[in-house]
């Protein structure tokens, strides 16, 4: 469910723009450690990046879930107002933007840990390379 995804720091497609344009994410990089020939230093840095990313996205996700529960409760209790709807939905939107930025920034940070040939291999292994050699 969306709630579980938010609480678990799941990607939910938030980094698709990065992923499809040559910016690998740490979870898939770790899954491809051997074929990408990651060095020990790269693997350790990627594990650290993923751990920090999950911590941050779970924290933001929990905040989103809490606000959504407040919104639900306001409707359930018949205590909702136009002003409160505006406040809560604005807070949720800000957090969702922060969450997406966190996912995208993690892909940027991951890419900086890799060599150009590793990024190219990642694209191919993930099936993003077309016969013309371009990605998507």
Model features per residue range: what roles?
Residues 1-136:
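Charge-rich (acidic/polar
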């Amino acid at each position: 469910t969306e709630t579980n995804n938010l609480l678990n720091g799941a990607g939910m497609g938030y980094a698709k723009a990065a992923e499809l344009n040559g910016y690998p994410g740490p979870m898939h990089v770790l899954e491809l450690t051997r074929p990408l020939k990651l060095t020990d230093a790269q693997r350790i840095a990627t594990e650290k990046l993923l751990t920090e990313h999950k911590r941050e996205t779970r924290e933001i996700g929990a905040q989103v879930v809490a606000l959504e529960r407040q919104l639900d409760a306001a409707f359930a209790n018949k205590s909702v107002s136009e002003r409160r709807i505006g406040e809560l939905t604005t807070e949720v939107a800000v957090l969702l933007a922060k969450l997406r930025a966190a996912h995208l920034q993690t892909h940027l940070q991951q890419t900086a840990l890799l060599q150009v040939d590793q990024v190219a291999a990642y694209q191919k292994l993930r099936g993003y390379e077309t016969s013309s050699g371009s990605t998507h």
